[in-house]
Regions:
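Inter-domain helical "communication" segments and dimerization helices
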Residues: 1-6, 103-111
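Conserved binding/recognition cores within well-folded domains
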Residues: 1-85, 89
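C-terminal structural segments of small proteins and small subunits
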Residues: 80-106
């Protein structure tokens, strides 16, 4: 059976699996999706909608039409950018800034 904490994607005819906990963020580059992990970058053909369908409600935040981040690897949050634990700085688009702020406020209250 499929594991709830895995991300599945196709490379050629093969189905690949990564643990969600290992994924720093997803980046959309045209018709390709880049999966950034500590081990490096894996690329597959797909859409961000396909990514959202698998990671929704599992600790990932949409911060931009081209970026979905694993909240566990966000080290610094600013109004218009996040910095990941690996030092990568990613933009937060205007569309998602209010949502990000409310998510972080909620986390801060719970913490």
């Amino acid at each position: 059976h499929l594991m709830k904490n895995d991300f599945f994607f196709h490379i050629g005819k093969a189905i690949q699996r990564l643990y969600l906990d290992e994924i720093f963020y997803f980046a959309c580059n045209g018709k390709k999706i880049e999966i950034h992990t500590e081990a490096g970058v894996t690329t597959f053909y797909g859409t961000m909608q396909e990514v959202v369908a698998q990671v929704d409600g599992k600790g990932f935040w949409i911060i931009h039409k081209s970026y979905i981040v694993n909240s566990s690897y966000v080290s610094i949050y600013q109004y218009d950018v996040v910095q990941m634990t690996d030092g990568t700085i990613l933009p937060i688009s205007q569309k998602y800034r209010k949502l990000m702020k409310s998510c972080l406020t909620e986390l801060y209250r719970k913490g």
